[in-house]
Structures are given as C-alpha cells and as structure tokens.
Amino acid sequence: MNTTYSFQIYKSASLLPVEWNLLAADNIFLTREYLEVLENSSPVNMTCHFIGIFEEEKLIGIVLTQFLFAEKLESFGERDKCLKTSVRNFALKNFASHVLFIGNNMLTGQNAFVFDKNIKQSKAIKTLHKAINQLKKDLKESGKKVHITSIKDFTAKEIEPLQAEFKNNYTFSTQPNMIFEIPKNWETEQDYIDALSKKYRDQYKRARKKSDGILKQKMFLDDIKKYEDVIYDLYFHVAKNAPFNTFFLARNHFSFFKEIMGENFLLYGYFLDEKLIGFNTLIKNGDVMDTYFLGYDESVQREKMLYLNMLYDMIAYSIKKGFREIVFARTALEIKSSVGAKPVKMYGLITHSNALINHNISRFFNYLEPKTEWQERNPFK
C-alpha cells in the first residue's frame, strides 16, 4: 500500500506532538526539553522551527531548523583582521546574512533529524525537502528571504541519501569533529595517564602542576544565576576572539539550560583567589558526553594552562562515569588532538538562492569558511 507522507512546521516546542520524544530517545538534542531551551534562550539572531513528518497520522520523523540573520551580529570574529577577512565579512553581510540551517549550528554532528527506523528513508527525505521549501516560502512572506540553505553535519555514510535527493546542492566539508573514544577497560583517570607516551604524560604533569591554586567547583542553578554575568563575560571573550562566529549566546542561556535539563547539563566553575576565572559545560547524551561552551580569563589561561586542564578534567569525568566517547567538536583541533581526540570528517550540503552565486558556490564557500591548517598529534604509546 502506497501511503502518503506529510509534514507540519512548528514555531514553538510547546506545540510539538505528544509522541515527539519517542523518536528523540537516542538524541537529547532533539528532545522537546532541549528544543525548549533553544527556543527560549537562543542567540539574538536565531529563530528555530521544528518539523514533524507524518505517515498518515503517525509521527515518523522529527527535524530541527535554525534561521540565522547575521545583520544583527556585531562581529563575525575579531581575531583575524586582514583584507580577506574584510572581503569575507562584506560577502557575509550582503550575500549570506540570512542562513537556514537544517541541523544545529551550535553543535557538531548529526543533530538535524531522526526518522522512524521502519519507514522508507528516501521518501522521508523527499518530504523533508518539501518541508524546507515551504519553510523558505513562509520566511520570505514574513520579509526574511533565505540566502543560504545548509544541511549539516554528517559523516560520509550519513550524507549519501541526502545527496541523492538534494542533487543541486554543493557538498562541503569544514573542520572535523574531534572525537575521543574511551576504551572499555578504562575506569579511572590513571588508566588514561598510563596510556600516554612519555612526552604527553610530561605535558599532563606540567599542566596539572600549573593549575595549583585553582579550585574547580560543580555549579548548581543558584550558583549559575549568581555568577551569570561573569560566566557570560568569560564566554563572550572566547567567542568574539574566535576567527569566525555566526552567533552569540543569550545571556540567560546557561541558567535556562540548567533549569530545564537538570543533571544532563553540567557547568563547572574554576576559581582563583575566590574569583571565577573560567568555566566549562558538558551535556550527557546517552553514553556520549558532548562538550559545550566554555570561557576563561585570557591572562590566567596562559599562566595556568587552564584550557588544557579543562580538557583533562572532561576526560577524567567521562571515564569515571562510564561514557563511551566524548564529542570535543570543532575548533582548537591541535590541542584536542594532543589529549587524544581523533578527527572525524564531517560533511554538509549548501545551496544559494542566487543562481549565479550558486553556480560558483564552491569558491564562494571558501570565502565564508576560513580553512584551518593544523597538525594531528598522537599522545598514546
């Protein structure tokens, strides 16, 4: 029997079908609760929509989209000031300021959609294509024409069925996703230290010695609210000094996240002389630990090797709690590699509404996405 697939676009997590979370069981980043966090504490230049795909009356697919309007952004990243950066920022403002992401631009990995395992995937993807076109039409009618549509992030195998449907899209690959696989026989941080080669064990010891005097503290909701402004300033310092940025978080993002997600969201503060000088965040996603945003005082970070110590702390916690892997995501590839994370190449699809630009999308894309040169390390024996 040839049943028809349909779709429904939702503007609020409160309107999602009651059975939504059944499909999101294996990915916290598609649950109603997380989508509520996104909706209520998203970056100032981001609007989220959620798509349900149905077979007759049954929900068989769930999708997250994010619409970014970059003209509200003060900076695309302040670290690199040169002619190419100026050209890139001009191109962004004029030809790429309205971007529709199918997926989550705040995370790395396949957090775009989930389909029921018993349905015909190609048919669901075709319905997704129709839903995207409808959403673009709706946005245009509200005065927000989409310049770029991007479907992200997928492994080489995951992207194949999408390439078959979205034939006019350009397949791109940006920075890899840095993944730390935790061997099953590791139970403590010492197991990790013992596996390091002498050079990297010395690096570990040096970093830990440098962190003398720093107190690490798990922060609860009241603590996060108390230090909200300091936390945000530490985050913002790191974010605005990144070479490229398409959004900045809302000031209440971390407290709202903690309020809704509870123990699935962890925020650790780093104190020196009773002053908060850094923080990092972790999200429990089944047996996978996702690292999230962090921030630090630059003057202390260099002297105390704070960032490296945060990475070691994340590894130690994840081993102790029995997680299978840690998603260290993009950026700072070399230092993440030096603690044992391995690069996994990720792909996405992109198309531009302007036919001329779309014809030259590969060259245009290189302007928008700065290439990162880095050297992979292997810290293990």
Where in the sequence are the language-model features?
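Acyl-donor binding region in acyl/amide transferases
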Residues: 47-48, 70-168, 288-348
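Active-site/acyl-donor-binding loops of N-acyltransferases
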Residues: 2-4, 67-68, 110, 154-155, ...
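Short C-terminal domain-edge/linker segments immediately following a structured domain
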Residues: 38-41, 82-84, 92-98, 180-184, ...
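Generic recognition of stable, solvent-exposed alpha-helical segments in well-folded globular domains
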Residues: 123, 127, 191, 199-202, ...
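A conserved beta-strand-loop-helix scaffold within acyl/acetyltransferase catalytic domains
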Residues: 3-82, 147-302
